[in-house]
Regions:
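Short Pro/Gly-enriched beta-strand edge/turn motifs at strand-loop
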Residues: 81-82, 151-155
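A generic local secondary-structure boundary/capping motif
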Residues: 87-88, 141-142, 157
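Extended hydrophobic
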Residues: 153-190
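Short solvent-exposed loop/turn micro-motifs enriched in small/polar/acidic residues
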Residues: 91-93, 137, 164-166
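A gly/proline- and charged-residue-enriched helix-loop-helix capping module
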Residues: 132, 137-138
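Intrinsically disordered, low-complexity terminal regulatory regions
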Residues: 1-126, 184, 190-212
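Acidic, low-complexity proline/glycine/alanine-rich linker and hinge segments
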Residues: 67, 138-139
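Soluble sensory domains of the PAS superfamily and closely related sensory modules
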Residues: 139-151
Length: 212
């Protein structure tokens, strides 16, 4: 936690400010506030702290030398990527970053709908190549990977401060035999968080599954 940390910057949004207070208390060793932070997020915070996780934007994204192209990943990138592009075109007046990952959180596809005026808060999301908990701490993709169900994280529900101005929404993608093969989601700035975004992530997930 930075020395200049100030939880009052979200004073106009009590929900986000509550997350900030819970996070700052946890980071100071004052325990978890279970009235504000869910069990899944609290457990993820504890794993990050106990494992001394450091933010790793690049992650471990390289394939094994000589490894054949993963047709499943190619399918997710092409099919899911096109669906995300279509949605972001419809959201042209807003600020979103759409993402497809593998089942572990490695980014396969990423796209913003605000190329001409890309939000400074979203720039860091575009740089992340691996959303697994071990590389990016607590985030919507790491929690989907852990729980195998749609998840949203907003503001200081994330473990790392670079996410605190953002809200993320992600859903799992399952194969025909019910194995999770990837994840799809969207990030926006926290002030524009809304549960309808999670419904879009679920809709894309189901459309991808129907294309398998």
């Amino acid at each position: 936690m930075s020395q200049s940390y100030n939880p009052f910057y979200n004073i106009e949004n009590p929900q986000l400010m509550g997350y900030e207070y819970a996070w700052s208390s946890f980071m100071r060793g004052q325990g978890l506030n279970n009235a504000i932070i869910s069990q899944e997020i609290g457990q993820s915070w504890e794993r990050c702290r106990n494992g001394r996780i450091q933010m790793n934007f690049k992650g471990n994204t390289s394939n094994t030398p000589g490894e054949a192209p993963n047709t499943q990943e190619t399918f997710l990138k092409q099919t899911g990527g096109k669906m995300i592009a279509d949605i972001l075109e419809a959201w042209d007046n807003d600020c979103f970053y759409g993402i497809i990952t593998d089942a572990h959180g490695k980014k396969l596809f990423g796209m913003s709908n605000t190329h001409r005026n890309f939000s400074k808060k979203l720039e860091k999301v575009g740089e992340i190549e691996d959303f697994s908990e071990g590389c990016a701490g607590t985030n919507c993709f790491s929690l989907v990977s852990e729980t195998c169900r749609p998840f949203a994280t907003a503001g200081a529900q994330h473990y790392f401060e670079c996410f605190h101005g953002l809200a993320g929404y992600a859903a799992p993608i399952f194969s025909a035999n019910y194995q999770m093969i990837g994840m799809v989601g969207f990030y926006t700035i926290a002030e524009r968080m809304d549960e309808y975004i999670l419904s879009f992530a679920v809709a894309v997930e189901r459309a991808i599954e129907n294309s398998l």
